[in-house]
Design a protein with these regions (language model features):
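Portal/gating segments that form or line small-molecule/metal binding sites
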Residues: 1-120, 130-172
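Feature captures the catalytic ectodomains and active-site-proximal regions of enzymes
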Residues: 127
Length: 172
């Protein structure tokens, strides 16, 4: 998910993958971020550089409700952002029960890890890069329990990237 120092400069950029992965963003009602991803996103998308880099995506992100998980941030400068000091299962269930379309998490491996362990993620959208990092930050940390996934869709690209959509297999 990231190099040993948190770097993501190894990730391949591909306009086709960006287009495919951004299709669901206009139907997203809430974005969730851990503090590191929040800082990165809030430091770019509201700025003139972010708005000119991808005007449609910037408009969606800037106008949509957001939750940032952080024990250190005292206030959120990015409009429409709620800060939560910890991941509270009842609060997540309340957010999921609201009428609407989709809650999307960008990056934020620790949040994905915790929500996965609690069984609160309905779908995983992953972009597989043809890069072996060797060391670094894993998407699923040591707390994640084993889970089976059902493949919903897979798309391959000339760049070598693979876009994957999985649904956790629910026990019957």
């Amino acid at each position: 998910m990231a190099g040993s120092k948190g770097e993501i400069d190894w990730a391949i950029r591909d306009d086709e993958v960006t287009e495919l992965s951004s299709r669901g963003q206009d139907s997203t009602d809430l974005f969730m971020f851990g503090r590191i991803t929040y800082d990165m996103m809030a430091g770019f998308w509201p700025t003139p550089a972010g708005k000119s880099a991808n005007p449609t995506f910037a408009a969606i992100l800037n106008s949509t409700s957001k939750v940032a998980f952080s024990r250190t941030l005292k206030m959120a400068d990015w409009p429409n952002t709620e800060l939560l000091a910890e991941l509270n299962t009842d609060r997540i269930l309340e957010l999921k029960s609201r009428p609407g379309k989709t809650i999307m998490i960008f990056g934020s491996g620790s949040i994905v890890d915790q929500l996965s362990t609690l069984g609160l993620i309905d779908e995983y959208q992953l972009i597989l890069n043809p890069v072996v990092l060797g060391r670094g930050k894993r998407l699923f940390g040591d707390t994640a329990a084993m889970m089976n996934l059902d493949l919903m869709d897979a798309s391959t690209f000339k760049s070598g990237l693979v876009f994957l959509r999985y649904r956790p297999t629910r026990k019957k």
